[in-house]
Amino acid sequence: ENVTGDKAGKLDYSYLGMEGVSFIPIKCEDEYAPIDVKMLENVDALIVEYQDSGSRYDSFTNALFLLFQTIHLQKISLSVYILDRSNPCGRQVEGTVFTFADEWAMGIPGIAHRHGLTLGELANLFYCEIGAKFPLHIISYLVRSATQYMMPWSIPPHEDVPGLFTSQFYCGMR
């Protein structure tokens, strides 16, 4: 499947020169629904590359959590590679943390409103929390502080968060 376009869920990977590589969108219409196992059939490795917004409301982060649960519970033999980037809102942690008994609609239970973690750190947290055994590889994306806020986003983390500066306001930064 080729994915083209320039909005969340509609991406153009032609610049990568990766003919013959399939790209699978993991975000579903219902972002809290389990991932369809059929999507993972005949997949050798999964590369996750997107910029987290720094907020627990990030729908792609929710999809990653559900993806990890699916791989773990279905015992799918799949290596997962996370391209880790800095958190656009920095390391500050604030806001409420709710339990699994609370409603899922506000994001992943156990994660603070502004979590202060990178995508790789979130992935490692999810992996450990569910007791996963599949191969997880976190690849650091080094960013110099001078260019940190000018990083291009290849995939917006949410339809309502089109850019890096939006994420700082979205999480309630003053």
What is the meaning of each model-derived region?
Residues 71-79:
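A short helix->loop->beta-strand "cap" motif at the edges of active sites that frequently abuts
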Residues 5-8, 81-103:
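Glycine-rich, charge-decorated loop segments at or immediately adjacent to ligand/cofactor-binding or catalytic sites
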Residues 32-33, 54-57, 87-93, 145-149:
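Short, well-ordered, mixed-charge alpha-helical segments that flank or form enzyme active sites
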Residues 15-42, 55:
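Glycine-rich oxoanion-binding loops at beta->alpha junctions
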Residues 52-64:
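Glycine/threonine-rich flexible loop motifs
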Residues 45-53, 81-84:
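Short acidic catalytic loops
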